[in-house]
């Protein structure tokens, strides 16, 4: 049996339909360098703050410099990712049109599948009705043959 189309076939959810956490995960998967840069920058700030508290100004200065460099690298990754993965308004509208066409095609396929199933069901009903009628005819014929046989036996028994 062929795979049936379903109204639950969803390939990609729209960003508007996602929760806040799902959106964060989606964007982190799309541009993995940005969250890595954020984590490294945060680590550099924490180490710098720890060394400031301990009074080690040389190491604190060292980690603050790392923070600046990591923050710059994160911004470069963010801009580069936006440039690479960014889409214009026309591309978004084209994608929307494709999704609408795909939805219409799915609906059309679903209707065709339902019509095919209906035809199969109707054919099965007709076959079942024909089988019932044939069974009734055969039962009547069997009764007639049994009656004829009993008549013949009675004739033979009388002679």
UniProtKB/Swiss-Prot annotation:
Segments on the Mitochondrial intermembrane face: 1-13, 58-63, 107-133
Key words, A-Z: Coiled coil, Membrane, Mitochondrion, Transmembrane, Transmembrane helix
Pfam family, one: HIG_1_N
Phenotype seen when the gene is deleted: Increases frequency of mitochondrial genome loss. Promotes reactive oxygen species (ROS) generation.
Mitochondrial matrix side: 31-35, 86-88, 157-159
Topology of the protein relative to the lipid bilayer: Multi-pass membrane protein
Bilayer-crossing regions: 14-30, 36-57, 64-85, 89-106, 134-156
Subcellular location: Mitochondrion membrane
Other known facts: Present with 1210 molecules/cell in log phase SD medium.
Family: Belongs to the AIM31 family.
Subunit field text: Associates with a subpopulation of the cytochrome bc1-cytochrome c oxidase supercomplexes. Associates in substoichiometric amounts with complex IV. Interacts with COX3.
Function: Assembly factor that plays a role in the assembly of the respiratory chain supercomplexes (SCs) composed of ubiquinol-cytochrome c oxidoreductase (cytochrome b-c1 complex, complex III, CIII) and cytochrome c oxidase (complex IV, CIV). Involved in the recruitment of COX13 and RCF2 into cytochrome c oxidase. May also be required for late-stage assembly of the COX12 and COX13 subunits.
Name assigned to this protein: Respiratory supercomplex factor 1, mitochondrial
Name of the gene: RCF1
């Amino acid at each position: 049996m062929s795979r049936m189309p379903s109204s639950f076939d969803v390939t990609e959810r729209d960003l508007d339909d996602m929760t806040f956490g799902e959106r964060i995960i989606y964007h982190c998967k799309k541009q993995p360098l940005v969250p890595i840069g954020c984590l490294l920058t945060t680590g550099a700030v924490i180490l710098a703050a720890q060394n400031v508290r301990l009074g080690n100004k040389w190491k604190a200065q060292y980690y603050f410099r790392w923070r600046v460099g990591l923050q710059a690298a994160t911004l470069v990754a963010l801009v580069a990712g936006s440039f690479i993965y960014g889409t214009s308004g026309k591309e978004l509208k084209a994608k929307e049109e494709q999704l609408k066409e795909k939805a219409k095609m799915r609906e059309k396929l679903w209707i065709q599948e339902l019509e095919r199933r209906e035809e199969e069901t109707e054919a099965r009903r007709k076959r079942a009705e024909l089988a019932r009628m044939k069974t009734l005819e055969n039962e009547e014929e069997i009764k007639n043959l049994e009656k004829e046989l009993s008549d013949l036996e009675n004739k033979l028994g009388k002679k």
